[in-house]
Amino acid sequence: SLTGWQTESFYYYAGMCDKFEGRLIPSEVPNMHNYLKWEPFGVVALILPWNSPIGTLIWKLAPALAAGNTVVVKPSERASCSTLELMSILEEADLPEGLINVVTGYGTTTGIPLIEHNDVRMISFTGGTKGGSAASLSASKKVKPIIMELGGKSPQLIFKDADLNLAVNGVVSGIFPVTGH
């Protein structure tokens, strides 16, 4: 079930918290060494799509927190309620104030200003190609890293000999069952 893997995601990334450590990388140059040090970005913006808003939130939230970041979540204006409900549940977990924040609104009036905010150091965006293009352009203005997943709608091939009713059912259930509507 979705609830099961979402819970497992939190446990998995909670187990990663103490795995982010530096390491010495050998160098062939005398008297020189390379050191890899993992550091949190600080504030990470998580911008969510309308379809599977909770699933996408967990995929983004758990690793961002495990890496030591604070987050600002911007759910889709078409599916904000499930995110807001999860936040009210997380408030009961006695998390530090300001660790997880939510802003709602449209991409142009809320998402773009969030991306361009000076305190936001990294963006994780899932949505359509038009929104992704605007998000990427805004992030590039401030030279901020952005991770994007754009327009995935479970494409499928349906062959001539396929059971059409079963195929249509599969296509629809690949997109809509956890959309937050």
Report the location of each language-model feature:
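Long amphipathic alpha-helix in the N-terminal Rossmann-like dinucleotide-binding domain
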Residues: 1-21
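Residue-level signal for inorganic ion chemistry
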Residues: 10, 68, 100, 123, ...
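A structured beta-alpha segment of the ubiquitous adenosine-cofactor-binding alpha/beta core
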Residues: 33-34, 101-124
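Hydrophobic/aromatic ligand-binding patch that stacks against planar heteroaromatic rings
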Residues: 63-65, 114, 138
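Short beta->alpha connector loops at strand-helix junctions that form conserved
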Residues: 69, 74-76, 104, 126, ...
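Hydrophobic residues in well-ordered beta-strands that form the structural core
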Residues: 73, 79, 104, 147-148, ...
